[in-house]
Design a protein with these regions (language model features):
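Short, structural beta-strand-to-alpha-helix junction motif
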Residues: 3, 17-21, 317, 424, ...
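Short beta-alpha connecting loops at secondary-structure transitions
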Residues: 5, 68-74, 180-181, 219, ...
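Structural motif
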Residues: 6, 52-54, 761
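A basic, amphipathic helix-loop patch mediating RNA/tRNA/ribosome contacts
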Residues: 19-53
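Fe-S ferredoxin-like electron-transfer domains
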Residues: 46-225, 229-233, 238-242
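Long, contiguous, secondary-structure-rich segments that constitute the structural scaffold
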Residues: 442, 450, 624-680, 724-740, ...
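Long, low-complexity segments enriched in small/aliphatic residues
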Residues: 487-491, 655-733
Length: 811
């Protein structure tokens, strides 16, 4: 510990603490431009200069650690004069175009000059000028080089946190520009974090350009509706219209960063295609009707249904999901309840809940990042959970840590990995079993996984020598026909590691914002809220469709889920629902599933409701209403209350009941959920008691010379489900789908990036452009599931697992 005196105030801090941080702990604010806590130290802007007793020269506080007995002055005349001079140097070239700059009103340079800057400049020379018109870098980013103050926040966050390394400095001195190599932006993730960290108006958002001033916006703190990382952000709205989404420094687990879909995926809220009126099918066609007529019809049909079921989206709030299962169980008398959950069966979802300890206490990702070894399996985390990717990359900068990634495709995070294993899709259970055997010193058999025994032994050695291990299990386990077995093999691996006295935790990587919350709330055929076992297991999604296909489902309630577009066998899903006696769909768009409904109820988007999400850590966070639902729509909670006769006045009332039913939530107060939220505190519950069945037969049968490629799917970095396709900005960034293959396959076939090919499976075929991904596993093809005009689920057949395809170069 070191005791220092700052402006006469004595404070004791940890050895090595920066003077800047010590001063802030003591209550003294020091201005900075180049410094940000999560970025590497630069010390270039010199705004943070302070005087240290006994030293002649002022020192940059952002790179200078305290020493015991040090005396520091941050506000004397010498420091103030130096600070004003630095601002004068910056203003010598900075254009004073504040009235037309989008950063006006929230510009750090503007604020610092007002507080500490000179009132008259010592410089009269002509200002440096790179261009007269701003440069449009992409559909989301505008660059004004004239305003840049060379703090290099943009360069460092792109390189160190995002991992894109799309930006760098060219030129020298005052002529330096922060830009991309030859302005190509080949590696840009379009996340907009350069916009967020820019202290001036050099990087700007094109969708927000000239739309508003910050003081005109009504700002609402909420949580991202896409993946389950649970990023916090702030919605800026004016006159009921969402104009931007931004993040706040060191706020939430995302710590100011957002991905492209989080920052730019909001325009679907104002889409012209939003549902604005209830509809009832009359004479074979949907027609607008009153709310009273629509709700009465739903009540009547479910009251008279012999067998009914409900499927809900994991993008709904905890409160909505809780009421949905309460409505289905208490009012409609059925346990046939499930969420999309990547359409896994109840045995697989139960295994995921059990193996990842979702009924136990939540585990913060920051604690998981403290592990000596991070093991990711079954997830394209860079695409499915981009901000989790950022957090893992930041942790991996510590070279004492080991990062092992196992996934068939090469992903961006591979650049930070110590070991990268490319296994054959569907063989996850074999790979994990082989790693466990190697850890236990047994013979390694990795038949059909395409991973060499030497690589498995190397990974096992790294795991065996680590004392603190974090395992991340991805959504591929929920997609895979062998997912349950793979999860149970992970459980066997954790037991083997724990038996040697090591600390190991398993966390899920989920691709829907409230998937964990859906299970916590009892939207599951086996579990009630709080993971109490239901009296008689109900049907999961697949079983509901099976029953419906045989004419055995009288009424189906589908809330926020597009079953036809997303279920892995579109033809079967459509055919099954066509035989249901009655279908009600509650959604914000007229999806393919909604088009089949007998009644359609228009609900609300995440920006139009209050409630909570529970992210993949088990962190409960508030979402807050920023605007009213579009004219004619109603909040989902309101609709459920009307159907069930519930008398809750607000989401907080429902949450109070959740606390009684789900013990892990009992100590959480709805109105006190600010900042980083609260981790659930449950108790260990053994749920499955299942044993893995090594289904090598399914993997071995995958060999097929006629269809040599295994086709896998998932989310693209710029999209999540079909929802983000309604955001025009994201659609502009990735306007059309593609098929991705490995560099080895492309070389053998004589195919290059951009070539048109036909992807032909047993049940479907499409024409797409090729993207070549060097480092991916040979024999694996990938098509994102996000494109409405290319329904990749048509390639799948229920019960057959991973489809096989052939790729034919178009002439």
């Amino acid at each position: 510990m070191a005791t220092v005196k700052i402006n006469g105030k004595e404070i004791t801090v940890e050895d090595g603490t920066l003077i800047l941080d010590a001063a802030r702990q003591a209550g003294f604010e020091i201005p900075t431009f180049c410094y940000q806590a999560r970025l590497s130290r630069l010390g270039s802007c010199r705004m943070c200069l302070v005087e240290i007793g006994g030293q002649k020269k002022l020192q940059p506080s952002c790179v200078t650690p305290v020493l015991h007995g040090m005396e520091v002055f941050t506000e004397n005349q010498t420091v103030k004069s130096a600070r004003a001079s630095m601002l004068d140097f910056l203003l010598a070239n900075h254009p004073l175009d504040c009235p037309t700059c989008d950063k006006g009103g929230e510009c750090e340079l503007q604020d610092f000059v007002f507080k500490s800057g000179p009132r008259h400049s010592a410089f009269s020379e002509k200002k440096r000028r790179f261009h007269d018109k701003d440069e449009i870098l992409s559909p989301i980013i505008v660059k004004n080089h004239n305003r840049c103050i060379h703090c290099e926040r943009c360069v460092r966050i792109c390189d160190e946190v995002v991992g894109a390394s799309a930006l760098g400095g060219i030129g020298r001195g005052a002529k330096t520009q922060e830009t991309s190599f030859w302005n190509t932006r080949l590696d840009c993730d379009h996340c907009g974090n350069c916009i967020e960290v820019c202290p001036v108006g050099s990087f700007m958002s094109l969708p927000y350009r000239y739309k508003s001033r910050p003081w005109d916006l009504k700002e609402t703190d909420t949580v991202c509706p896409y993946c389950a990382t649970g990023c916090q952000f702030t919605i800026g709205a004016r006159n009921g219209e969402v104009l931007r989404v931004r993040s706040k420094i060191e706020t939430g687990i995302n710590k100011e960063t957002l991905c492209a879909r989080g920052r730019f995926g909001y325009p679907f809220i104002q889409s012209e295609k939003r549902l604005k009126s209830p509809m009832i099918k009359k004479n074979g066609a949907l027609a607008a009707c009153s709310w009273e007529e629509a709700l009465s019809q739903v009540k009547l049909k479910f009251a008279n249904a012999g067998k009914s079921a409900g499927i809900a989206s994991a993008r709904l709030t905890n409160e909505e999901l809780y009421l949905f299962q309460k409505l289905m169980r208490n009012t409609f008398k059925t346990n046939n309840i499930d969420s999309g959950s990547r359409w896994a069966d109840k045995a697989t979802t139960t295994a995921m809940i059990d193996v990842c300890g979702l009924a136990d206490e939540g585990v913060s990702i920051s604690d998981a990042m403290k592990a000596d070894l991070i093991f990711i399996i079954g997830s394209s985390v860079s695409d499915e959970n981009p901000i989790t990717d950022y957090l893992i990359r930041t942790a991996a900068l510590d070279k004492r840590k080991t990062l092992i990634i196992t996934y068939p495709r090469r992903i961006k995070l591979d650049n930070s990995a110590s070991i990268s294993l490319k296994y054959r899709p569907g063989s996850e259970h074999i790979l994990v079993s082989a790693v466990t055997a190697a850890i236990e010193g047994k013979a390694v058999k990795a038949d059909f996984s395409d991973v060499s025994e030497a690589d498995i032994a190397m990974a096992a050695k790294k795991i065996s020598t680590a004392s603190n291990i974090s395992v991340f299990a991805g959504t591929d386990f929920l997609r895979s026909i062998n997912g349950k077995d793979a999860l149970l093999e992970i459980e066997n691996m954790t037991k083997a590691i724990k038996s040697s006295g090591k600390n190991i935790r398993v966390m899920p990587l989920l691709d829907r914002c409230n998937q964990r919350g859906a299970w916590d709330m009892g939207v599951h055929p086996v579990f009630l809220p709080g993971y109490k076992t239901a009296a008689g297991a109900g049907m999961d999604c697949g079983e509901i469709l099976d029953a419906s296909s045989k004419g055995g489902m009288d009424a189906v309630y589908i809330l926020g889920e597009d079953v036809v577009s997303m279920y892995p066998d579109a033809g079967f899903a459509r055919g099954a629902l066509s035989k249901a006696g009655f279908i009600v769909v509650q959604d914000i768009f007229l999806t393919e599933t909604a088009k089949m409904a007998d009644v359609v109820l228009p609900g609300a988007s995440y920006a139009e409701k209050d409630g909570t999400f529970t992210n993949q850590e088990g962190r409960v966070q508030r979402i807050r209403k920023a605007i009213q639902p579009v004219n004619g729509a109603r909040g989902d909670l309101d609709i459920l209350c009307s159907l069930g006769g519930f008398r809750y006045k607000c989401a907080g009332d429902v949450f109070d009941e959740i606390k009684k039913e789900a013990p892990a939530y009992k100590d959480i107060t709805f109105d006190s959920l600010y900042g980083k939220g609260v981790l659930v505190k449950g108790e260990k519950i053994a749920l499955s008691g299942q044993q893995p069945v090594n289904r090598k037969d399914i993997v071995s049968q995958a060999e097929d010379k006629q269809y040599p490629f295994l086709l896998i799917t998932g989310n693209h970095l710029l999209h999540s489900g079909k929802l983000s396709q309604k955001a025009l900005v994201l659609k502009q960034l990735l306007p059309e789908p593609f098929v991705e293959i490995s560099g080895k396959d492309a070389a053998e076939m004589g195919i290059k990036d951009g070539d048109m090919v036909t992807v032909k499976g047993r049940y479907h075929e499409v024409r797409l452009k090729i993207r070549v991904k060097k480092g991916s596993l040979k024999g694996v093809a990938f098509i994102a599931e996000n494109f409405e005009d290319i329904p990749v689920n048509l390639f799948f057949k229920k019960g057959e697992g991973i489809p096989r395809v052939k790729i034919i170069k178009s002439s």
